[in-house]
Amino acid sequence: MAGTEVTDSYGRRTVFQGSLLISDTTDTDDERKPQWLDIDIWRTNGGSYVVQKAVRYRVAHAIATCGRLGGYEIRDATEADTFRCPGCNPNGDRHSSWGQESRIAVDVYSSPEQLIESLKVDGKLTRLSRALLADLSEQDGRIDELWNTVVVD
């Protein structure tokens, strides 16, 4: 089956046919954030939603076992890793050899209700979630119906 293939941090592949509804980032044009989120949302030809969230980093670590890594994968540091880790190299006087790999999650939701619920943090929609839903509602009638219509008893 030809189509779109996305892979999470564990190597699990999700393959589907559909269209990209939104691709957004919390990064800035001047790349001044040490950590940011990239999010892509597709609607499959069958009507499900595929969400890929990638937490990305520009932090250089001096110690491969730095506690701020939280057990996540590391890689060789690159020129893009412009922020020194405040935990293992706060003064910048140690050579920073390691960068943190992106953490990528891929989830599939069978309904717009499930998708909207998945965008909540601690049971509430964040500013980012609301902006995503506003953009998504312009492209998907099912999301528009749920998101832009509030029914009050």
Residue ranges of predicted features:
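Exposed acidic/polar residues on beta-strands and adjacent loops within beta-sheet cores, strongest
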Residues: 31-35, 57-58, 145, 150-153
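Predominantly late transmembrane helices and immediately cytosolic-facing juxtamembrane segments
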Residues: 46, 54-57, 62-64
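Low-complexity intrinsically disordered segments
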Residues: 76-84, 89-153
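Amphipathic, interaction-prone secondary-structure segments
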Residues: 20-49
